[in-house]
Amino acid sequence: MKLVFASNNAHKLREVREILPSHIEVLSLQDIGFVGDIAETGATLEENSAIKARAVWQWMSLHSSPETATVNGVFADDTGLEIAALQGAPGVHTARWAGEPACDAANRQKALQALQGITLRDARFRTVVTLIMTGEMQQVEGFVNGKIALEESGKGGFGYDPIFIPEGYNQTFACLTEEQKNSISHRGRAMQALCRLLNDLKQ
């Protein structure tokens, strides 16, 4: 099976390829010749995930090529960090919370500064995945509960990984191995849900 992942984020692409089983070949936007960014204008993770998947699906319908001829579908994800003490922020604004252009380090510092002096540091990561096959759209999601650390630690991962401590652990995502993170992360769980959906669609 061939699926196009509707994202220009190289970190996400690598994680998705590591998580999904080997019988699912994940193509990048570069692989199919799609150039440019997709404006994420939705008010929710569900809307933004759908916007990205639809944009690439519609583009493929207008740009037939040997690369797209064998593609079975398109999927996209949108991920949000939801911090309880901040009423669910940054949420849909997670990637660009500190402003344009998107900067992981600046986003992390904004989170730490916003929680200075606050003991309630509960948070969760949520990923919504949109799948389009034969024109039909379906969505699944995955999430992981945790808390925001007092300071950055760890050198792995990306984004908010150095400040997010998943439930049941005393280290941030950035301190875990990729295998450990992928087995419990929001994106890992969303990809597991995607696999279950794909299996259901085959039956």
PLM region spans:
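Anionic-ligand binding patches
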Residues: 2-4, 10-203
